[in-house]
């Protein structure tokens, strides 16, 4: 285990103690909700251009290197790691012994070493606090977080004044100049996404919940498409809101908490999230008024304001943080063109096609430097920034799991209909999407009459309880059908161009869209 020398070392403090330290250190203030409110300066989201993976003998042929998985040499990593250790040796540091992964076979022990008390609280909220000594002889991973230390691109071989470096061979994650806490959780997500496929576990960027009878649903999607909102269901039990593994026998959470977007949060629309933001939680870049009351509609600091809280703040939760293999899988896509249906039933080949495509929108992007507003994107596996291996590795595992369980996969559009974004279209309301999700989870949607949507070749229901029938076929929601056809053809062409890069069996390629008739 890595030995950390520091001026003062605080080990395994309670959340209350970490909050006291954070306030005393001037890292944040207590809000009217009781949650700790912090700001992160210019870095209010992930910094994908500053994320690196050490390229060595073990990883050279296993990682899909490129703009997302940028290589860095072992020597460069070692030098920066040593610099971070020297920097922290002159300061008080906070250390917590945690774990990622709620499955006894696949969890990783994790030692989190942070300069900021609130970063350690974040780790305690988001990762899993083990009961007793649960390491089972497994070697521990180490996160080293030094946000006050800045990098020099010329000296340190990086791109800016901050860097995230993942060393898969040495079980180390280094964060320098990175005050945005989400970098810690996404770094460990990337680690699990690399480690688990060889163990026949599909890692997923998805939320998961369970019904009264134990039936499990998965919600895949990029940030802002509805994973956290739709999985926080008042009639179901939450497993997790963001990162899970699907083994031959179960679905299990990687985390022990939630990291919810706060922009425009309302008690009426999202009561479970609203009520979870209390003492023990963290509000990141949420604007407070002079009385410490959060204004969730104020995007002055960022569109990507966040709340981190432990699962224990959600009353309806699955206690052991895992469930059986899923009965329903939902791909949440936010279609800006307004041409996709609110729900479609996918074959396993279509599931692989849309999983690899990952078509959606960047809604209030989580990335630093992103264009304000909304733009469409193709994000492989509904989470391209977090998957180190080639995308087909994950797609093949997904198809294997679908075949083994027979679970139904659905494409659910949480975006626009009746026209494109900014061109007369309207976004599906949360109540409409919830009604669709309820129809999916009841099992009734797949039993009713269906039709095929031309061009996309998607099987869509003719009726769904609680949803206006005319909304189910997007072609019928446009006043000008020829305008719909033209817009649909444009999106179909984008799908085809994006898919050219994948080497897949013909059955998967042919499951994609064809020309509009």
From Swiss-Prot:
Keywords: ATP-binding, Cytoplasm, Decarboxylase, Gluconeogenesis, Lyase, Manganese, Metal-binding, Nucleotide-binding. It is an enzyme of class 4 (lyase). Substrate binds at residues 46, 180, 186, 306. GO terms for molecular function: ATP binding; metal ion binding; phosphoenolpyruvate carboxykinase (ATP) activity. Mn(2+) binds at residues 186, 205, 242. GO terms for biological process: gluconeogenesis. This is Phosphoenolpyruvate carboxykinase (ATP).
């Amino acid at each position: 285990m890595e030995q950390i020398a520091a001026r003062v070392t605080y080990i395994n403090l309670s959340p209350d103690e970490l909050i006291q330290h954070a306030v005393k250190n001037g890292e944040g203030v207590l809000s009217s909700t009781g949650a700790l409110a912090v700001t992160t300066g210019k870095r209010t989201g992930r910094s994908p251009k500053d994320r690196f993976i050490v390229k060595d003998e073990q990883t050279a042929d296993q990682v899909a290197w490129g703009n997302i998985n940028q290589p860095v040499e072992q020597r460069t990593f070692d030098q920066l790691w040593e610099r971070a250790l020297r920097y922290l040796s002159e300061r008080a540091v906070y250390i917590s012994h945690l774990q990622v992964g709620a499955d006894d076979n696949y969890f990783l022990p994790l030692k989190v070493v942070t300069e900021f008390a609130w970063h350690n609280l974040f780790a305690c909220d988001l990762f899993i606090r083990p009961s007793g000594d649960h390491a089972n002889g497994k070697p521990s991973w180490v996160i080293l977080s030094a946000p006050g230390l800045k990098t020099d691109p010329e000296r340190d071989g990086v791109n800016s004044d901050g860097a995230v470096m993942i060393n898969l061979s040495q079980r180390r994650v280094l964060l320098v100049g990175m005050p945005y806490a989400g970098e810690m959780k996404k770094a460990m997500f990337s680690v699990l996404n690399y480690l688990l496929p060889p163990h026949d576990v599909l890692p997923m960027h998805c939320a998961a919940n369970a019904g009264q009878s134990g039936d499990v649903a998965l919600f895949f999607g990029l940030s802002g498409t509805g994973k956290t909102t739709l999985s926080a269901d008042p009639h179901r039990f939450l497993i997790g809101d963001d990162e899970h593994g699907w083994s031959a026998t179960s679905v299990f959470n990687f985390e022990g908490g939630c990291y919810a977007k706060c922009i425009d949060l309302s008690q009426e629309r999202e009561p479970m999230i609203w009520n979870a933001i209390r003492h023990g939680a963290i509000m990141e870049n949420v604007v407070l008024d002079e009385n410490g009351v959060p204004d969730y509609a104020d995007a002055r600091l960022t569109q990507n304001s966040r709340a981190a809280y432990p699962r224990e703040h959600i009353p309806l939760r699955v206690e052991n943080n895992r469930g059986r293999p899923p009965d329903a899988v939902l791909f949440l896509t936010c279609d800006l063109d307004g041409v996709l249906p609110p729900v479609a039933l996918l074959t396993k080949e279509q599931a692989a096609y849309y999983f690899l495509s990952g078509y959606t929108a960047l809604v209030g992007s989580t990335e630093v430097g992103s264009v304000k507003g909304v733009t469409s994107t193709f994000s492989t596996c509904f989470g391209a920034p977090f998957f180190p291996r080639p995308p087909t590795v994950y797609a093949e595992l997904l198809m294997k799991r679908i075949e083994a369980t027979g679970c139904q996969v659905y494409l659910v559009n949480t975006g626009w209909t009746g026209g494109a974004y900014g061109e007369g279209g309207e976004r599906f309301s949360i109540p409409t999407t919830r009604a669709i999700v309820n129809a999916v989870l009841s099992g009734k949607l797949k039993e009713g009459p269906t039709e095929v949507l031309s061009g996309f070749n998607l099987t869509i229901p003719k009726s769904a309880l609680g949803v206006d029938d005319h909304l189910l076929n997007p072609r019928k929601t446009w006043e000008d059908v020829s305008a719909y056809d033209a817009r649909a053809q444009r999106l179909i062409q984008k799908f085809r161009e994006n898919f050219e890069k994948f080497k897949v069996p013909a059955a998967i390629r042919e499951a994609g869209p064809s020309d509009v008739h």
